């Protein structure tokens, strides 16, 4: 039996990078995969690429920073499948500046999507999990939440906030059959990172004890583990997947 057989999983930001790798892995493991992201054109193209691999998933253009839209989308999923088992809060953006240059708009944009958006998804989906007495919630944090990062006050604040949210909700929901955990990726070789100058990439690799960047599939594997029955006794944890950066 596949590890997510007959599970209904919503993945936010699920059409590129880590989210895309997660969608593929979850579909391979038997989950009914629903992807939420803002870019409809890219979402539809990714669904077609999955079909070409013999995998099924659904896409809906959902802005996770819009609570009403999230609630409506969650209801549609629950109405169709009768349950929502898994939420992977993977959506996130950056908009970097030093404190002196950062505008209030830059701050708020990142807060709205990374932190508020994750809360909105949890708030909207948890009632359906409570109805069934089962749920797996995984939030995407970052290693920078653990040690800070120059020029990323907004981003780091959201990722640290997600760790606090994870621990608090784990206490609230654990006895009701719902576990809440976080994954803190290190330097991951997404398309955006791969376009950086080689000297910058060399500097990034030098900070990682295993001597290389991580792959999106390695973060997807962490999501898969925490969403599976194998992690049933893990709750409120933050799993660092960073090649040893934070030791």
Regions found by a protein language model. Give the residues of each.
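Conserved glycine-rich cofactor-binding loop
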Residues: 15-17
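The beta1-alpha1 cofactor-binding region of Rossmann-like NAD(H)/NADP(H)-dependent oxidoreductases
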Residues: 40, 61-72, 104, 217-218
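Substrate-binding pocket helix/loop in short-chain dehydrogenase/reductase
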Residues: 98-99, 106-111, 193, 204
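C-terminal substrate-recognition "lid" of short-chain dehydrogenase/reductases
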Residues: 119-122, 130, 134, 212-241, ...
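Short, small/polar-rich loop/turn modules that mediate ligand/substrate recognition or access, typified
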Residues: 174, 179, 234-236
């Amino acid at each position: 039996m596949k590890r997510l057989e007959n599970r209904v999983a919503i993945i936010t930001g699920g059409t590129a990078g880590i989210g895309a790798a997660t969608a593929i892995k979850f579909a391979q493991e038997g989950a009914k995969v629903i992807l939420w992201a803002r870019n409809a054109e890219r979402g539809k193209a990714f669904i077609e690429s999955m079909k070409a691999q013999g995998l099924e998933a659904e896409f809906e253009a959902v802005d996770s920073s819009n609570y009403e839209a999230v609630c409506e989308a969650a209801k549609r999923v629950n109405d169709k499948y009768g349950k929502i088992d898994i939420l992977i809060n993977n959506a996130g953006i950056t908009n970097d500046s030093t404190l002196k240059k950062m505008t209030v708009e830059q701050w708020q944009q990142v807060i709205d999507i990374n932190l508020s958006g994750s809360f909105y998804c949890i708030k909207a989906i948890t009632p359906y999990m409570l109805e069934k007495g089962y749920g797996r919630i995984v939030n995407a944090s970052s290693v920078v939440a653990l040690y800070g990062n120059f020029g990323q006050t907004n981003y780091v604040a959201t990722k640290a906030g997600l760790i606090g949210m994870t621990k608090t909700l784990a206490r609230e929901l654990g006895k009701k059959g719902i576990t809440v955990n976080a994954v803190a990726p290190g330097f991951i070789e997404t398309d955006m990172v791969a376009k950086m100058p080689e000297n910058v990439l060399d500097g990034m690799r030098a900070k990682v004890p295993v001597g290389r960047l991580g792959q999106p599939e390695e973060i997807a594997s962490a999501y898969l583990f925490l969403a599976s029955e194998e992690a049933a006794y893990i709750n409120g944890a933050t799993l660092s997947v960073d090649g040893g950066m934070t030791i």
